[in-house]
Amino acid sequence: TEMSACEGVGALPFERDSWQEEVLLHDGSKMVITRSQTYGGRHEVGQPSPIKEHTISFTLPNTDKTIRWTSEYSEDLGRTNFQLLAVHALNGTPYLVTEPNLCLSYNKWGRPNPPYVFFKYDGAAWQRIPRGAFPHEFTTINVALSTIGRKGADLVKQGVVSSEKIQ
């Protein structure tokens, strides 16, 4: 069996990073989220692999229900669809703020203006919601934004990243 040097690029399994972050909610309370990401997909020769899939999971305060969200790999993008910006909760309902991951994702998700995609968990699944349905109480970015390379490795080493280090 022959294989060219380029045939396997982006097809090999890559490592997974995982860490926890303490998220400061709008009311001053905190919750811990677990984040993990895998690497792979299309990229230029000599460049690191992009984030292929990004997952968060958390238990809402005062509940025992674990909630999970994944920004999955998209073949048309060659990477994950979204970059996470914030995790919020109001009256037991979680919300997410994400941004499309580069121009192809921005186009795929309808060129939102401002360039954010909002999600609300309806008790069974995550649903995209319009900006106007996103609670006005949420005004902050409350998760680590730089999660690749050395900065990602630093997050993993810290165990639980405190909310003070994220702000």
Positions of predicted regions on the chain:
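Sec-dependent bacterial lipoprotein signal peptides
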Residues: 1-4
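N-terminal export/targeting and maturation segments
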Residues: 6-66
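Structured domain cores in non-transmembrane regions
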Residues: 40-117, 121-125
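Acidic, small-residue rich beta-repeat scaffolds with periodic aromatic anchors
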Residues: 90-167
